[in-house]
Structures are given as structure tokens and as C-alpha cells.
Amino acid sequence: MSREEQIKKLNQYLDNRELAFRAKDGDKNIFHTESQLDSSLKKNTAFMKRCKSSLTSENYDSFIKEIKTLSLKKFIPEITAAIVEGMMKCKATKDILSSVKIVWALNLRFSTAFTGPMLANLYCALYPNPGYSLCHESYFELKQNENEVSEKDRSSHLLKVRPLLRFLIEFWLNGVVGTPEDFVSYLPSTDSNDKKFRKPWFEEQNLKKPLVVLLFNDLMDTRFGFLLLPVLTSLVRTFSCELFTTEDFEDKETLELVNRLNPVVWRTYLRKSLNSYVDKLEVYCQKRKSLFEELNKQYQEQSIIRADPNNEKFQRLANFSKSIESEFSSYASLSEVLNRKASEDLLELNFMEKASSGTNSVFNASGERSESANVETAQVWDDREQYFFYEVFPNFNEGSIAEMKSSIYESSQEGIRSSSENNKKEDDLKDSTGDLNTTQVSSRVDNFLLKLPSMVSLELTNEMALEFYDLNTKASRNRLIKALCTIPRTSSFLVPYYVRLARILSQLSSEFSTSLVDHARHSFKRMIHRKAKHEYDTRLLIVRYISELTKFQLMPFHMVFECYKLCINEFTPFDLEVLALLLESCGRFLLRYPETKLQMQSFLEAIQKKKLASALASQDQLVLENALHFVNPPKRGIIVSKKKSLKEEFLYDLIQIRLKDDNVFPTLLLLRKFDWKDDYQILYNTIMEVWNIKYNSLNALARLLSALYKFHPEFCIHVIDDTLESLFSAVNNSDHVEKQKRLAQARFISELCVIHMLDVRAITNFLFHLLPLEKFESFLTMKASTLTNINNDMFRLRLIVVVLQTCGPSIIRSKTKKTMLTYLLAYQCYFLIQPEMPLDMLYEFEDVIGYVRPSMKVYMHYEEARNALTERLQAISDDWEEDDTRPVFQGANDGDISSNEESVYLPEDISDESETDEESSGLEESDLLDSEDEDIDNEMQLSRELDEEFERLTNESLLTRMHEKNPGFDVPLPLRASSLGSPYVTRNEESASESSHVMFTLLTKRGNKQRSQYLEIPSHSSLVRSTKNQQTEEIMERKRVKEMVLNFE
């Protein structure tokens, strides 16, 4: 209110008071009425009804006109009751002022005859019980568990008390009432015999006091708390000039009018009483603040522990925060009226906004984090860059903003040094600022929103926040909030910067944090409800919003855990994917943050139990395990990195990185240049780490090792033996932890088999070794096997698939064809007996059988595969020639393959394919078959040697035979009967019978004539011995081939 309006108001009060006093003294010429007053019953009754229901500012003129024209004298008692009832219905200020003027006009006409009963009725309406204060507990219904008044009861009581008190104060200022003596005689009886009223209305010393002083004393009664604090605050604000002005007021004219209206004594008394009341209110507000913080912390902890927020408690807490905010605002207003400094702790309302909106962090008024909070979160972040991004924010106070503006301006003017140029730039800056002030705010906001997608750094975010500081209006805030909530689904990388901007601007208004939290929460619930209808980019964007709001501590922790709980309720693949994204985004933060550490640990344990109890697919299980490992990786010791020498680095780059199919020969040339005596161990370690080589480059490594065999055979044999030994050891010990390494080794030995660097028998033995003994027993006895370790079975099956995919066709075309056919049936039984296999392994199973043996049927049921295997084994058993009681699957010694002589399962039909007949004419074979006392191992050894030799002869490639030298044309030698008394054969037999010499025919040619002559060569010469051995071997070979063809099934 301006000074002129205030002076006019005070003069009006003084004029009305003077007229009221004159009317009280009996002056009848103050209020002029019509000479002929209307005494119509109908009009007078209508006036009474209108006083009861239509006492408003719109009807003021009609009321004044009727007061001047109607008699109304006979109806004064009814009018007093009706007008009090009408005043109780007035709520608006203009209606109250109009009603005061109407009552003041009636007071001028009828004086005490109307005023006394009217004031008595009004006072009785305000005080139903004369001995009780306005804030007595009898006016409210207190809760049973809490000493608090319900909001409904409090609001209804305030709506009733506020207008009545306003009427009485206005009546006092206008002179309608002065002290209780004016109406005390009209009050109901308070005799001690009356059970209803046991105390008098007023004490004798209070009858002489102004009614306003008594009313304010009653309002400032703190015996029953501060329930009427809003009423007192509104009245003090409204009548601060009339009732609480001090003597040192600057405006002397106003002070003089106030002194005439309200004496200094009573103003001083009211200020003193109000000052005492504010002191008590300050202590009360401090207690309420502590109680609020305690309840807030308690509710937050309970919601975090249960991962299920209690909405009723948080709604009650929100209402509690609103009441505290109202009390603190009233405290600040009363302190301002009394010109006293209010407590800074009570003036800070940000903490209540954060608590009501669910903010977890505690910041001071400038937005800085407290030192205790800094200590608690010191170990939350991985590096200082994350700490500064999520924990350090600019302050929006005058000093910091001026400093930031000056730093930005200096950075833009970095190249300018001279003072004159600096002054010119400052003038330009001022001019541009003036121009900007003339620009419409909407266009500036448009430009600001267009620059949001380019905000991709911490510095740009701070600058954008500072720029918005000058655009802080309700409309601009709403537009910015809408832009922050509508990020394109393919631009999830902008979410951290957008949320940081909202965190900085939350110092200006809590709308930024609450709006983003509500948007993210509703979007997440809608996404979980719709399941797979959302695209991956949309899911990632929503989860990123939740995570960033959690890291900036804008979203309450109980809401975050509520999102986690929604993901594990149904535990579908969609929920698992969302849960994994949440864990990877903010799971580590929640696990490290002190307030949520225990809850997050219990939540991770619940996820582990749910995972074990659910039959998850391998892909879903892998995704969830990776997320859990990312959140809480196992503790490991510090890995000391071994410093490699220059040669080791060169070999690592040469073999494990650059080795490909097209550079095997250059690599071989470089390796040959090494000193193989001094660098033997380095070369061995590098080549043995086959898992460090690219999986597609293992073929090149096998070819490289085959080429090295010509120069360093011992080294190559050492590498192959150790690789096989490592594989056998891993299979026997069920060491499938480093399964990727074992798969690489299996691929490596398979590539060696393809290029004939490794014998087929070694691969076959390894394949049979991958089928465990208990499985074969179950196949033979036709009983279902007991699965003890499904992970071990899956590891073995994957090794089998790798080997068959790499060298399966090569093995099936070798001498082990029948063995491999039997093995493929056993492999199908082994695979189909598993209870449940992943889809990828099922597809590999179907593909590998068709790749190795296209004509073989792929069985999909265990019973069919078992019957086929049984028939196959029965046919082999019937065809066995040596021992009908011998088992079909028998352990074979693998000493010729690996140095540790591992036991493998080798079908004996391999020997049956290459076994020769007893009637062979070869000397060694006939001796072997005729010696019954010889050991069975020697027989198997010799049979194996014959099989290997036969394989060498039959598997020679056409390319190798093309490069061999063609033998000379064998023509029959001419016979000379005149010089030889016996035919050629006879002479040859005679010469062969001689022990000292052997006859050879030498064929020569001169011109077109051939000539022959005989030579006697000593029998001990190398030519004679090699010729005899060659003839013997050819005879034996022809007989073996003939017998095998005859015995072929």
C-alpha cells in the first residue's frame, strides 16, 4: 500500500470513529434518514433475510438505501442476530469491508440499542465457551498417536475465526466498539450455578482494556501451540501500520495519525507481546525442523530397506513439510513487522523442497555439498573427472554469477591486451546487454533451446545454466522442462548433460528436479507394462534417465529401488534386459553409496537367488551375469604386469597379431633367423599361447608349425605333445573355467590334423576321450545316465563340435571311417541325453552331423539314437573274428600320441579294418601269426604299424606322385643260348644259390642295338641287399592288398 493510500485510510478511520462517538453520545443528526420511514412488514422482513444471506459488497448501496428508508426499529433484535449470521459467511476482504460500513451505518442510526446486542452475538459466535482460548484443544479433534491437529479441522476453524476477528478489529478502528464494557452487559449469564459456563467472560482489569489488545493476547496464547499462527500473521500484516508502528517511524505525518488512532502505550504493549510470541515461535520452528529431518530420514531408510515406498507415509511427510513451510513463512513475516533479524536456518526452505520432491542429497543454500557429504562420497566415483561432473556445481549467488560472467568475458577477450581496447569492448558488451534486454524473452528462449543438443561438455553445461539465469520465468521454465523431457531416442548420450543442467537450475526452482523425476518414473512404469513394444533405443534412453537422476541424487532412492523391484517381479527376458541396463548404469553407484550399500547388497543376493531358481536361457543368463559382475566384480589381487623383452614383444606382434594365411612364409623366414638355442623358451611360450591368436588365424599357425618341422622337428613335437597334454588334463579335471583357451587349443590340433601334421588316430582318441566312461556304460546297458555336472558336459560337447567342424571331413575319409560312423552315433546319444541344451548348441549339433557325414540321419530323440547305436555295436560284435566275448569299447594306450600315456576309448574295429590274414606269405607276418605265446600288446603294435604303412601308401596325394621320377621301362633281357647252357631263370637261380656272389644283368645300348652282359656282385653289398628287400616288400604288399580286397564287406 502506498503512503497516500495509507494516510487516506487512517483519516477515514479517524472520521468514522469521531462520528461513532457522537452517535454514542446521543447525537441524532449524524445519520440522515427519510422523513417518512417505511414500516412495511414485508420490506422489513426482507431486509432481515438479506442481512442473513446477502451481506456482500455488491449489495452495499441497496443496504444503505434501505437503512435510510425503512423503520427497522421494531426488528432490532432480529436484525442483530441476522447480521451476525451474515458476517460469519463473509470471506472476501471487500465483503468484510462492506459489511463493516453497513454495521457502522446502523450504529450511527440506532447507536447502543443495536451495537450492544450485535457485539454480544458476534463475541459469542467467536467464543462459544467464555473461559476457553481461541486455540483451545476442545475446538479440535486431536489424533490418537500424534499430538497434531488434522488439516481438515484446522482449516475449518481458521475459516471461521479469521473473518470474525477481522470484523472486531475493524469495528474497533471505526469506533463501533472500544472496550468490553460496551457489550458485556448483553452477554449471556455466566453464573456459577450454570453448568455450561463456569468462568466469567472478562476479568475486571480487562474491562477497561481495548478489545483489540484482548483479542491479540488471546491469539498469542501459546499454551496449546501455534494453531492460529496463520490468522495472527494475516492480521498483523493487515494492521501492521495501525497497531504495531514504532515511535521512530520515518513518516511523521503517518505517525501522527497513528498516534491519534492508537495510543503509543497499547502499540508498545502489542509489540512486546508479539516479540515474546516470535521468540517462542522460533524455538518451536527449530524443533519442527529437527522432527521433519528425522522423519524424512526414517522414511527414506525404511523405503530403501523394503524397496517398496509407503505412499501414505510420504504423503503425510509432504503435508508435514507444507505446514512447516507455512510456519516458517509466518515466522519471517512477523520478524519483518517487528524489524528483527530472522534465523538463517529457518529462512532456508530449499531442504523442504528437496525432501518433498525426494532429493537425497543435502545441500546448503548456495547449492554446495557439505563437508560430511563430501567425505562420504569420496570413494563413490572412479576418478576425479566423474566426481567433478556429478558432485561439483556452480552457485547461483550474486558473487559467483559475477565471477562466472567475468571469467567467460575474459576468455572471449583473451587476445586483447591494451586498456583502451578493453574499455571499448566493455562498452560494446553493455550496449549488447541493453539490446538483449529489449529483445522478447520468448525469442531468447527459442535460441537457448536450439543450443541444447550442442551441450556436450561440463563447461558448456555451466555456461548454459548461467545463460538461463537471466531467462528465469515461469513460462521459460516450463519450456525448458519440456525440452529436457523430450530427448530424441537416438541421443541418449545427451542425458547426463541435460540432468546436470536440471541439477544446477534446481537451485532456482525445484520444478526441474520434480518434473524430470516424475517423467522418468512414469515412462519406466509404462515401459515395464508394455514389455517388448518399446524399441531398444527407447529402453536405453529411459534407463539412462533413471540412472543419471540417481547419480545426481535428484531421484529418491526408494523410487530407484521400486524400479528395480518392478524388473524382478516377473523376471521375463524383457525385464532381465532392463534390469541389466539398470545395473550397468547405476548399480555400482548404489553399491558404493553409504546410504544404499546394505540395501543394494541384499538386492544383489535376491537377484542371484532368483536367477538360480529360474530356468533362464543361456543368453539371458550371460547378460545378467555380466551385469552383476560389472556392479560387484570379484576382489582380486594386484596384477603385476610382466615387462617383456624386445624379442618377446617382436614375437608377440609377429605371431599373435600379424600372422595370417598370406604371410606364413615371411613369418617362417623371420623365425629361422632366431637363435633357437638361446631363444627356445621364448619361442615355445609364444607359440603355446594359441588362445591369444585370432581364432581365424589358427590355420596359419598350424601351417607355420608344419613348415618349422623340417628345420626344428623336436620343437614342433614338443609343442604338439604339450598342447595335447593340456587338453587331456583339462578334460579329465573338468577344468572348464578357461574354456575359451581349451577351445582354441582344440581348434589348433584339429588344424594340425587337416594338414597331416598330426595323426588321425590322435584326434580319434581325443574325440573318444571327450565321451565319459559312465555315458558309454549307460549306452551299452540301455539305462539313463545320471547328470552330475551339466557345465562339464556342455564343455565336452563344445570341444567335440569344434573338432568335428574343423577336421571332421578329413577323419571320415581316412581309414577310421567305420570308427567315426560309430562315434557320430555315440555323440548323438551323448547330446540327446542332456536334459536341456541352448539353442545355439542345438543348431551346431544339427549342422555338424550334416557337415561331417551328410548321408547320416540326425536323430532328435534319445531313444532313436540309442537303438541305432545298439544295432551298430551288435553288427561290429558279430563280425569280430578274434574274440566274441571281447567288449566293443576298450581302453587303448595313447602313449604314441602324448607323453603322459593318457587313456582313451578306441573302438577295435580300427584294427579290424587293417588286420591281415593268417595265410600271408610275408615272413614277419607269418611268424607273428604262428607264435601263440607272444604277448597281445606286441600283436597290436605290429598291426598298428601295418595300418600306418598302408595309410601312407593309400593316402598319398596325386600331386606328390606327379613330382616322382618315372621308373625306366622294364624290358625282358635277351637270352644267348650259345653262351649259356641253361635258360635265364636257371642261371639266375644258380647265381642266387651261391652265397658269395649274386648275378646281375647289365643292359647297354650302342646305336640301335641292345647288348647285355652278366655281372657278379658280392652278396654283402648295399645294392644286393636293397634289391632283395624291395622285391620282398613288393611281394608282401601285393598279397596284403589282395587279401584285403577279398575280405572287404
Swiss-Prot record:
PANTHER family per UniProt: NONSENSE-MEDIATED MRNA DECAY PROTEIN 2 UP-FRAMESHIFT SUPPRESSOR 2, REGULATOR OF NONSENSE TRANSCRIPTS 2
Subcellular location: Cytoplasm
Annotated segments matching region Disordered: 412-438, 909-934
Lineage, broadest ranks: Eukaryota, Fungi, Dikarya, Ascomycota, Taphrinomycotina
Residues modified as Phosphotyrosine: 60
Record keywords, A-Z: Cytoplasm, Phosphoprotein, Repeat
Basic and acidic residues bias locations: 422-433
Name of the coding gene: upf2
Paired cysteines (S-S): none
Superkingdom of this protein's organism: Eukaryota
GO cellular component, one term: cytoplasm
Keyword check for Cytoplasm: yes
Domain MIF4G per the UniProt entry, residue ranges: 41-282, 446-634, 649-855
UniProt GO MF annotations: RNA binding
General function of this protein: Involved in nonsense-mediated decay of mRNAs containing premature stop codons. It interacts, via its C-terminus, with NAM7/UPF1. Could be involved in determining the efficiency of translational termination or reinitiation or factors involved in the initial assembly of an initiation- and termination-competent mRNP.
SMART domains xref list: MIF4G
Biased composition annotated in UniProt, kind: Polar residues: 412-421
Name recorded for this polypeptide: Nonsense-mediated mRNA decay protein 2
GO biological process assignments: nuclear-transcribed mRNA catabolic process, 3'-5' exonucleolytic nonsense-mediated decay; nuclear-transcribed mRNA catabolic process, nonsense-mediated decay; regulation of mRNA stability involved in response to oxidative stress
